[in-house]
């Protein structure tokens, strides 16, 4: 399979629920809740409400089968947290069960916002599939997991693949495994928080040209401007972590946006979309009175 040239997906876009995601479509904004719910279903609902109020198109969670993703040795390591004294206590404490996701599903439906998850193992894909999500996310950490890629693709749902900490050769291979149909790639840098000099936003148009599929941006920086710049450079969707308070306990809060920040990102992206235009230079009707008032004409000197 050639990696170059436009595909049907890049021309038509990728359908996620009731939204078409791709070039010439409004940027699809994903609020990454991830594990910022801190294991509290009520906090998860508050974050969903924040995303709705900001105007986001979707919220995303993370799902892991802990004993599959982590070794017994890793889980036994000492680590203090509100859930206990080991790394395993922490990991298990941050996972929601089936009944929690039933609440999440019902709350998102009532709030009229899409939800899906990045699944870190095949059992988690099967678990989330019970809720019939509109798509799946594959995290940068899983880009080289061919079994997970194939299992996720087998659901028949669109796949959003993050490409942080990955070489072009590794991305090439992942695209070969997944196929280009109903695939969206996200440019990303996997440091938390990411430095601006690590963001390399010019990779977005390069990836669009190389792979011929819609390309978006997953940001882990602390500011807002670079996410808006990603949209200007052609990102078909953007993803940012959200939190109620960046000072909260937890590993991802510091690289997340608080409610006001998320609202500003969505607002600014929509304003930029209005501002881009079609590239045809024209004189607008509202400029006509200004022409009459200020336009200077060449007056010959006798």
For each feature predicted by the language model, list its residue ranges.
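Catalytic cores and adjacent flexible loops of soluble metabolic enzymes
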Residues: 2-302
